[in-house]
């Protein structure tokens, strides 16, 4: 070969350089794509465009296939096709592929999958849901016998007595779901009570690249509940009657759910490593809509949100489709309290639940040598009484003393410095101690000790009282008695310390939580031990409300999810059933306000007859989406129909919530609400205003009249402030009252913000 043949003529040099550059760019792109890590993304396509689910799935591959290069690649990438309640799919994509897909004309939103966390013998009677009463919500709905509650959780333990089908009629004919046989679970375990059991693990398995080892995690790939959370929640919502339920002889009584004859559809989406992946949750919601559930109950949630949730949360978008099809979605508010702005599940179409205590508590008596008895709380000690013996303050005992046996036969007082109370109890026992008193911050949870030693928990204030006794007594002694159950007065209800608080950090105009229910020390079914155990959390308060909602669905079948939420809020109690004000645990303790418990404590005695409701449907939810900044194209795709937001864009303050929350009041504003009469024709209501301090409220009209041709009317509220400086939130209420016993109350939360700063 001649050298001249290797020389590029001048007129071809630019072409060759460009060609080589394109090849390099293409290779770099291939290397980048190969090296870019795939993750699971959910592609939301809004309402279904076809009735045939198979055509819907095929349309998903038509969208994904061209992006990935072939239909085969699309099938390999896609882990779920959402094709029943709405349209969308979950697939393994790189971030660049997800960005490209988000620009597709049929796509509403592309979101990366998230991990969500899992967040009785007395509850129903405490709330007034008395099964023996000849009238009331339980009696009028046959205890919910035709209702189907979908529980999205950690599965179900079908052998629990709480899921017996004694006395139940046939499975409702509208039910389209099924029970599946899988590892350690036989479909024959289902009955007329447990009518559906499915599990969803593709999101979980994809996260682990197919290497998830269920056995190592103490799990089984089936609907079977291995951790007890789903079983506990299901029995709290709709558990059958079970006499003599108890934990170590505590809280003995008849266990039952809020709707004890309702049916259970269990959708396992959470696993023993506390992982609940949104693609699995969304698929379960898709199936639940198809199956015919009346209520969805989800005792789980994400971390405190940092993005606009409706825009970023797969679950919130899927729940929107369920609500638009008439299915209320009840969710846990979270366990990150008592700090403010910790509430999760804040979309306005969700019913978000806070947790309270109730009038049943468990105390471990501690008697000092001066005959003063103090009541330890939150821990359970079931054992023999430890009689009077020497009481020592742990900080006064050296390690050498402990090794020498100074603690033998004695009780130790210990101030918790970290989350090591069980470790300390085990350490004390190993050194011969017969009992420990642990002073700590209260949690409002109920837990049995895992160490075989007498143990009592007190708050730091009582701990200081005990320490003072030790330091001022020559020979301090004490005894610890077994835990006892106390019911009724003088135990007052309080919002539990762990219950997440508002205001809503994403859309502060939307009040969250909506409602509160008992969630501390709830006794319900579990897979192991004696079959029942205590659990605490908004996970436990959520199914209490879900069961009540199931009863409402049967009592008021024409009510929308928003009407049900309104009835819960406007009939709620601000005092406990004995008439005592509800406090909120925290630092400091205070009277509860709307950011602690929404409308208040759920009141099933009144909830079916609220008089008026603040309803929301298609137009009201679109109003919210417009005010939240969604564009017309995204809203149209979400709804499955062409929609154009009005001009000017409506204010989020006018979203027809059963509450008014104004985070930035600087000048007079006017807020609009619409109420629908669900009471007697001819009802007349008058406004009763409890204005927040320094806030002026003017309601127009002050009287609402509902005739035979008028069941809906609109009123306005003018709000202004007399404050001349910024304030924290101030609280009040607006109540519409008639002469028939209806008091339709909504909470008001107003914060003054003065913006005329001079620089």
From Swiss-Prot:
The keyword Protease applies. It is an enzyme of class 3 (hydrolase). Residues 34-119 form a propeptide. GO terms for molecular function: serine-type endopeptidase activity. SUPFAM superfamilies: Subtilisin-like. Residues 1-33 form the signal peptide. Its EC number is 3.4.21.-. Residues 124-608 form the Peptidase S8 domain. InterPro entries: Peptidase_S8/S53_dom, Peptidase_S8/S53_dom_sf, Peptidase_S8_His-AS, Peptidase_S8_Ser-AS, Peptidase_S8_subtilisin-rel, Peptidases_S8_3, S8pro/Inhibitor_I9, S8pro/Inhibitor_I9_sf. It is found in: Secreted. This is Subtilisin-like protease SBT3.16. It comes from Arabidopsis thaliana.
């Amino acid at each position: 070969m001649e050298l001249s043949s290797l020389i590029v003529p001048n007129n071809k040099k630019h072409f060759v350089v460009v060609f080589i550059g394109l090849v390099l760019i293409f290779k770099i792109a291939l290397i980048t794509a190969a090296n870019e890590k795939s993750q699971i993304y959910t592609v939301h396509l809004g309402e279904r465009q076809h009735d045939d689910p198979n055509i819907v799935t095929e349309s998903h591959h038509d969208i994904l296939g061209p992006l990935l290069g072939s239909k085969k690649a699309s099938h390999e990438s896609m882990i779920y096709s959402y094709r029943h309640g709405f349209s969308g799919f979950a697939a393994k994509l790189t971030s660049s592929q997800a960005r490209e897909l988000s620009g597709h004309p049929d796509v509403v939103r592309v979101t990366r999958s998230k991990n969500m966390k899992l967040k009785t013998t007395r509850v129903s009677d405490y709330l007034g849901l008395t099964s023996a009463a000849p009238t009331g919500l339980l009696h009028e709905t046959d205890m919910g016998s035709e209702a189907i509650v979908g529980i999205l959780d950690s599965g179900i333990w079908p052998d629990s007595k709480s899921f017996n089908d004694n006395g139940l009629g046939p499975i409702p004919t509208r039910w389209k779901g099924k029970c599946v046989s899988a590892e350690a679970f036989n479909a024959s375990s289902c009955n007329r009570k447990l009518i559906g059991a499915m599990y969803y693990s593709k999101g979980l398995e994809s996260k682990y690249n197919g290497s998830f080892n269920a056995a190592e995690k103490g799990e089984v790939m089936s609907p079977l509940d291995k951790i007890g959370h789903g079983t506990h929640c299901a029995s709290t919502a709709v558990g059958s009657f079970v006499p003599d339920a108890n934990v170590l002889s505590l809280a003995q009584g008849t266990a039952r759910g809020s709707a004890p004859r309702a049916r259970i559809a269990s959708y396992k989406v959470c696993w023993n490593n506390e992982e609940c992946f949104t693609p699995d949750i969304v698929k379960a919601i898709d199936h639940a809509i198809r199956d015919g559930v009346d209520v969805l109950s989800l005792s789980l949630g994400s971390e405190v949100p940092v993005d606009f949730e409706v825009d970023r949360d797969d679950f919130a978008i899927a729940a929107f489709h369920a609500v638009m099809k008439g299915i209320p979605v009840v969710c846990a508010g979270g366990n990150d309290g008592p700090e403010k702005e910790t509430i999760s599940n804040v979309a306005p179409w969700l019913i978000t639940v806070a947790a309270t205590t109730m009038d049943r508590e468990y105390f471990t008596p501690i008697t000092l040598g001066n005959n003063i008895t103090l009541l330890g709380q939150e821990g359970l000690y079931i054992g023999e009484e430890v009689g009077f013996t020497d009481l020592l303050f742990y900080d006064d005992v050296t390690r050498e003393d402990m090794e020498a046996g100074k603690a033998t036969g004695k009780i130790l007082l210990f101030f918790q410095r970290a989350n090591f109370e069980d470790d300390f109890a085990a350490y004390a026992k190993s050194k011969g101690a017969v009992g420990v008193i642990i002073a700590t911050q209260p949690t409002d949870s109920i837990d049995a000790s895992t160490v075989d030693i007498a143990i009592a928990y007190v708050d730091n204030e009582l701990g200081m009282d005990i320490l003072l006794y030790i330091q001022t007594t020559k020979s301090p002694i004490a005894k610890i008695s077994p835990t006892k159950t106390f019911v009724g007065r003088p135990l007052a209800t309080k919002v539990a310390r762990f219950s997440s608080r508002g205001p809503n950090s994403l859309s502060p105009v939307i009040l969250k939580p909506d409602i509160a229910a008992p969630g501390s020390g709830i006794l319900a079914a579990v897979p192991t031990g004696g079959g029942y155990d205590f659990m605490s959390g908004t996970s436990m308060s959520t199914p209490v409300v879900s069961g009540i909602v199931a009863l409402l669905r049967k009592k008021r079948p024409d009510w929308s999810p928003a009407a049900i939420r309104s009835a819960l809020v406007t009939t709620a109690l601000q005092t406990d059933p004995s008439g005592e004000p509800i406090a909120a645990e925290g630092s400091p303790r205070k009277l509860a306000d709307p950011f602690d418990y929404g409308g208040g404590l759920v009141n099933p005695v009144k909830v079916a007859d609220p008089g008026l409701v603040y309803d929301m449907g298609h137009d009201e939810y679109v109003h919210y989406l417009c005010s939240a900044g969604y564009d017309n194209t995204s809203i149209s795709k979400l709804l499955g129909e062409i929609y154009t937001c009005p001009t000017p864009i409506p204010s989020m303050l006018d979203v027809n919530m059963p509450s008014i929350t104004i985070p930035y009041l600087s000048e007079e504003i006017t807020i609009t609400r619409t109420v629908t009469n669900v009471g007697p024709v001819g009802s007349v209501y008058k406004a009763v205003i409890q204005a927040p301090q320094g806030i002026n409220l003017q309601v127009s009209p002050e009287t609402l009249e509902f005739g035979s041709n008028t069941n809906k009317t609109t009123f306005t509220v003018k709000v202004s402030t007399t404050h001349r400086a910024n304030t924290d939130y101030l609280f009040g209420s607006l109540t519409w009252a008639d002469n028939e016993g209806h008091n339709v109350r909504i909470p008001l939360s107003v914060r003054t913000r003065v913006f005329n700063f001079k620089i």
